[in-house]
Amino acid sequence: MVKLALVVAEFNYDITHLMLQKALEHAKFLGAEVTYVVKVPGVFDIPMVLKELALKEDVDAVVTLGAVIQGATKHDEIVAQQAARKILDLAVESGKPITLGIIGHGANRMQALERVEEYARRAVEAAVKLARRKKLLKEAKYGGSTVVID
């Protein structure tokens, strides 16, 4: 069973709370166990807890959930891009799957609400698939024919 940690941004909590509920439902549907749910103030703060979660033995993958709503300045673009870059850096550094379930940048509130289920489900599904496939890859041995991990 894949063990997941979920990191949820509290900014735009009317949206991220729904994302959390959908993520929990989809994890259960996929047979994954959610071992941690960590709430952080905003999307920009998500990387602050990822390294700690990635070091835990009872976490196979981490799902990030958040919504960056478009404003009058480029703030949303900067927040989303910097968070995504650091999330990817931490995933590669830790060797554990960390998936991006962050709506935005450029989304307005209505668009974000329309994307809640899709982004939450896809982030959970990607985390579960990656964790399972990493385990299969670790155990795989080349025996003269192509090894396919799917």
From Swiss-Prot:
GO CC, alphabetical: riboflavin synthase complex
Pfam family, one: DMRL_synthase
Keywords: Riboflavin biosynthesis, Transferase
BP-aspect Gene Ontology terms: riboflavin biosynthetic process
InterPro entries hit by this protein: LS (IPR034964), LS/RS (IPR002180), LS/RS_sf (IPR036467)
Keyword set includes Secreted: no
SUPFAM superfamilies: Lumazine synthase
Annotated catalytic residues: 75
Record's function text: Catalyzes the formation of 6,7-dimethyl-8-ribityllumazine by condensation of 5-amino-6-(D-ribitylamino)uracil with 3,4-dihydroxy-2-butanone 4-phosphate. This is the penultimate step in the biosynthesis of riboflavin.
Full protein name: 6,7-dimethyl-8-ribityllumazine synthase
Organism field: Pyrobaculum calidifontis (strain DSM 21063 / JCM 11548 / VA1)
